[in-house]
Design a protein with these regions (language model features):
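Nucleotidyltransferase catalytic core that binds NTPs
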Residues: 152-186
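Small-molecule kinase domains that catalyze NTP-dependent phosphoryl transfer to phosphate-bearing small molecules
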Residues: 97, 106-154
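Short, Lys/Arg-enriched N-terminal segments with co-localized hydrophobic residues
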Residues: 1-13
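Glycine-rich phosphate-binding loop used to anchor ATP phosphates in small-molecule kinases
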Residues: 62-110
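Conserved substrate/cofactor phosphate-moiety recognition/catalytic segment
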Residues: 32-73
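Hydrophobic anchor at the beta1->P-loop junction of P-loop NTPases
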Residues: 19
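The conserved Walker
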Residues: 23
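Conserved lysine of the Walker
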Residues: 27
């Protein structure tokens, strides 16, 4: 059994995990694997199951907004430690409505099976994980480990002075300046 033990739960507050991407990308399969790995109580909300329960198959812009708010409300009502929600969330507004603690973008296909969704989908610029291959076990292990250790994708404040060193972008600080001044002095 693959259960991650790590640092345990991060405080007492429920954590919302959004698994989003095009239809057919593997969101549901990944959500199913991830729920097995997180400790404590885990609730999994699948968008199709929620739509079925509420008999709401409206995929217009307003219908999708309503669905994102519904997913948020259902997550907020939960007393679980983690709530995993897998839904397309094609627009930033829908992702923001859900207010995830962690966002997983399943980016494994170029186009989904529904043309209207393909046209509406805006690739996210903010996410914690970008899944690029359909290997749910591998990615669930990776994501669970990072969630349990609260390791996030690095972010930078591009308004601050930065420099590219050793092939990666990082904040510029006095130590870097000293290294460059020493190198230039030679």
């Amino acid at each position: 059994q693959r259960v991650h033990r790590g640092l345990g739960l991060l405080g007492n507050a429920m954590k919302r995990i959004l698994i989003m991407g095009l239809p057919g990308a593997g969101k549901t399969t990944l959500a199913n694997e991830l729920r097995k790995l997180l400790p404590g109580a885990v609730v999994w909300l699948n968008a199709d199951d929620v739509r079925r329960k509420f008999n709401d198959w409206d995929f217009s812009h307003d219908g999708r907004i309503r669905q994102s708010m519904r997913m948020r409300e259902l997550a907020d009502r939960s007393d679980a430690d983690y709530v995993i929600c897998d839904f397309v969330a094609p627009l930033p507004e829908m992702r923001n409505n859900f207010k995830p603690d962690w966002t997983v973008w399943v980016d494994t296909i170029e186009q989904g099976r529904f043309e209207d969704t393909n046209k509406a989908f805006v690739a996210p610029t903010v996410y914690d994980f970008r899944v690029t291959e359909q290997n749910a076990e591998k990615w669930a292990d990776f994501i669970a480990e990072h969630i349990l250790e609260n390791r996030r994708r690095p972010t930078f404040d591009w308004k601050k002075e930065t420099v590219q060193m050793l092939g990666r972008w990082q904040p510029w600080h006095a130590g870097h300046r000293a290294l460059f001044e020493r190198a230039l002095a030679k």
